């Protein structure tokens, strides 16, 4: 194919009117071969550094433009296989074909544009026009013309006159070409060219006065200030409360009944979405349609099953940068990070108490509202937490799934088993800061601390006796009432306290969990072991005032005292 020495070159008809010219064009070097238009001709690539400098709105704009360009090519009937870039963008991922190094500009081509009736919409024409500037503007845009595959030079001249307005767009000051030293970029405004250069040099001239953070463009600094200064842009129309994030406003709206039209008939709780109400109802019905194929455990919500499955794989892809701890779920890592920051962003409006997590605040609020949405089907007792209901159910079933490997004893709760194991391990992780005494159970430490303060806030109305712990007062009241609620299933004997029943049961089972490390002798009570140890140490702490005798236990000491008083033992 040849072109006339003067005038516009002739272009062979192309499929759908699209293609590249094979002719030499004045002002442009080299002879170019004809080829079909590809997605690469209308795609814009970013380096990793450039992509990271874009804010979210700019990245979203890029995604939309690239997807539109691809759809337009398909609309025009051009056979284009789906590029990896488009697949990534459709899935919401980062672009897959980011440049890892500086790109060298390819030799230009003369891009033949299309007749007006071949453009499906104006936006496509504008997009192609910008791409021409980006790819070929370096070589001068005065030679780029919109052409149709015309049969003669005269027909081409007539056609050309219809595109004067569009050709003028290529020569306006708004479309000046700015050459970046590292990347061949065409930017349509001088300010954009400056921004691009700042991103490549790493300069960040815009600094936040509050925290010292630097940004490469002013818009990034503005966005940062919104977060840093906690400016409340989003206002609740119902109560007037303002928030700095739209998501926080959405969560807040739930507290207003007028925006929660979906109400639970069982407990009266209201929700702003019917789907949320449906999920909530499963609490009352105990419906659990989602079953784990590995262990058979069932769940009421599919997302919880998905999270549960990770237990079987053992995968923990989310690691804490502070302590290195790994987590199977990203949200768990986010919650964990609050431990290091000490942040407690969730505050109770009733009492002012603050919490690390929103779920803890939700549970806490039930103390004030008295809400108990979790009801036992056996006895009708209600609870404010699902975990408490789960533990309660074991009372009816009698199930004891947690077994001690040392002695074979079984327990209803895992926490009770953990405490029990400390008998053998001698572990005492809870230490008193005042006296250094250590305990195996946290509640025992809490009770012990009151010794140092001397406080006895719990008083008996019958006799006036005061106690440090509420549970001790409850047990004391049984002295007056004669109540013995703890009954032995073996012999029928009843006791005031559960601890006494536990000790009594060892008579029937023969269990002796307290073992002497010196001689190996075992005892069914810790107090008996303590007394026994004095045999090995020779300690005799009990001494009468009237003589030099000493005793290693209180019973012998008491008998000796009665001898002094003339009493017969």
Swiss-Prot record:
Gene3D superfamilies: 6.10.140.140, Classic Zinc Finger. Transmembrane segments: none annotated. Keywords: DNA-binding, Metal-binding, Nucleus, Repeat, Transcription, Transcription regulation, Zinc, Zinc-finger. One of its GO terms (molecular function) is RNA polymerase II cis-regulatory region sequence-specific DNA binding. Residues 66-108 form the KRAB domain. It is found in: Nucleus. The keyword Zinc applies. A zinc finger (C2H2-type) spans 206-228, 234-256, 262-284, 290-312, 318-340, 346-368, 374-396, 402-423, 430-452, 458-480, 486-508, 514-536, 542-564. Residues 536-549 have a biased composition (Basic and acidic residues). The keyword Zinc-finger applies. Residues 1-31, 536-569 are annotated as: Disordered. Its main location: nucleus. It holds the Pfam family KRAB. Belongs to the krueppel C2H2-type zinc-finger protein family. May be involved in transcriptional regulation. This is Zinc finger protein 273. The gene is ZNF273.
């Amino acid at each position: 194919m040849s072109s006339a020495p003067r005038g516009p070159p002739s272009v062979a008809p192309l499929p759908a009117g699209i293609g590249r010219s094979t002719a030499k064009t004045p002002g442009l070097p080299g002879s170019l071969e004809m080829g079909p238009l590809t997605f690469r001709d209308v795609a814009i690539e970013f380096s990793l550094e450039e992509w990271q400098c874009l804010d979210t709105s700019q990245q979203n704009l890029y995604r939309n433009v690239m997807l539109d360009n691809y759809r337009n090519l398909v609309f025009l009937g051009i056979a284009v296989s789906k590029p990896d870039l488009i697949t990534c963008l459709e899935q919401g991922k980062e672009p897959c074909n980011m440049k890892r190094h500086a790109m060298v500009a390819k030799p230009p081509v003369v891009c033949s544009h299309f007749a007006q009736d071949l453009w499906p919409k104006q936006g496509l024409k504008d997009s192609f026009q910008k791409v021409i500037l980006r790819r070929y503007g370096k070589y001068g845009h005065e030679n780029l013309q919109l052409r149709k595959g015309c049969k003669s030079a005269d027909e081409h001249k007539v056609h050309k006159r219809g595109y004067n307005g569009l050709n003028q767009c290529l020569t306006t000051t708004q479309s000046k070409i700015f050459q970046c030293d590292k990347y061949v970029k065409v930017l349509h405004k001088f300010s954009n060219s400056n921004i691009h250069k700042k991103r490549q040099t790493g300069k960040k001239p815009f600094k936040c006065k509050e925290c010292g953070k630097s940004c490469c463009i002013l818009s990034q600094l503005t966005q940062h200030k919104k977060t840093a200064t906690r400016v409340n842009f989003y206002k609740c129309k119902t109560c007037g409360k303002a928030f700095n994030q739209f998501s926080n406003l959405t969560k807040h709206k739930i507290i207003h009944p007028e925006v929660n039209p979906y109400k639970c008939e069982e407990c009266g709780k209201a929700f702003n979405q019917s789907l949320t109400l449906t999920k909530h109802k499963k609490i009352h019905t105990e419906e659990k349609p989602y079953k784990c194929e590995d262990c058979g455990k069932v769940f009421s919500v599919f997302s919880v099953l998905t999270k549960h499955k990770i237990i079987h794989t053992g995968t923990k892809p989310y690691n804490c940068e502070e302590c290195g701890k790994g987590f199977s779920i990203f949200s768990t890592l986010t919650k964990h990070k609050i431990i290091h920051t000490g942040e407690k962003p969730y505050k109770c409006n009733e009492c002012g108490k603050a919490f690390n997590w929103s779920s803890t605040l939700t549970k806490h609020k039930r103390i004030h509202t008295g809400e108990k949405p979790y009801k036992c089907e056996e006895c009708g007792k209600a609870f404010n937490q699902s975990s408490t209901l789960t533990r309660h159910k074991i009372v009816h079933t009698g199930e004891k799934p947690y077994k001690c490997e040392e002695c074979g004893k079984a327990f209803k709760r895992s926490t009770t088993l953990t405490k029990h194991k400390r008998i053998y391990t001698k572990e005492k992780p809870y230490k008193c800061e005042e006296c250094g005494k250590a305990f195996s159970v946290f509640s025992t430490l809490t009770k012990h601390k009151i010794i140092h303060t001397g406080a006895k806030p719990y008083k008996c109305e019958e006799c006036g006796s005061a106690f440090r712990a509420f549970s001790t007062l409850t047990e004391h009241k049984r002295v007056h009432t004669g109540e013995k609620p703890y009954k032995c299933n073996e012999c029928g004997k009843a006791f005031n306290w559960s601890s006494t029943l536990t000790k009594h049961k060892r008579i029937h089972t023969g269990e002796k969990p307290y073992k002497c490390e010196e001689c190996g002798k075992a005892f069914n009570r810790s107090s008996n072991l303590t007394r026994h140890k004095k045999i090995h140490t020779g300690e005799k702490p009990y001494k009468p005032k009237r003589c030099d005798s000493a005793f290693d236990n209180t019973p012998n000491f008491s008998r000796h005292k009665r001898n002094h008083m003339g009493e017969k033992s």
